[in-house]
From Swiss-Prot:
InterPro entries: Ribosomal_bL19, Ribosomal_bL19_CS, Ribosomal_bL19_sf, Translation_prot_SH3-like_sf. This protein is located at the 30S-50S ribosomal subunit interface and may play a role in the structure and function of the aminoacyl-tRNA binding site. One of its GO terms (cellular component) is cytosolic large ribosomal subunit. This is Large ribosomal subunit protein bL19. GO terms for molecular function: structural constituent of ribosome. HAMAP family: Ribosomal_bL19. PROSITE patterns: RIBOSOMAL_L19. It comes from the Bacteria. Belongs to the bacterial ribosomal protein bL19 family. It holds the Pfam family Ribosomal_L19. Disulfide bonds: none annotated.
Length: 119
């Protein structure tokens, strides 16, 4: 067997199927498992997806939120077992794949228009 097919077989078993469709500009709730000593708890991180990167098992996404007036960004692996679930709360309409310009904006200027969805 070739190296590539072995790698594909191993990674395809690790891929998650419960991931909703989301893209840059969408507001998501990420339920991440946090280990503190011997305890494990779920921490909610809600914010705007500012980028998606990679494909397959290496895919990641970065979520940005404002906490106490300070911008906080967190990058999650898309297929990580440490992420319990992802919920999309708003679908944003943007014309860029990477929303790094949001870092320089604050308040109402950082708002994202909502995308219309067909039912």
């Amino acid at each position: 067997m070739r190296q590539n097919t072995i790698l594909e077989n191993v990674t395809s078993a690790q891929l998650r199927t419960d991931i909703p469709a989301f893209r840059a500009g969408d507001t998501v709730k990420v339920y991440a498992k946090i280990v503190e000593g011997s305890r494990e708890r779920v921490q909610l991180f809600e914010g705007v997806v500012i980028k998606r990167k990679g494909a397959g098992i290496q895919a990641t996404y970065t979520v940005r939120k404002i906490s106490s007036g300070v911008g906080v960004e967190r990058t999650f692996p898309l297929h990580s077992p440490r992420v319990e679930k992802i919920e999309v709360t708003r679908f944003g309409q943007v014309r860029r794949a990477k929303l790094y310009y949001l870092r320089a904006l604050q308040g109402k200027a950082a708002r994202i228009k909502e995308r219309r969805r067909d039912v």
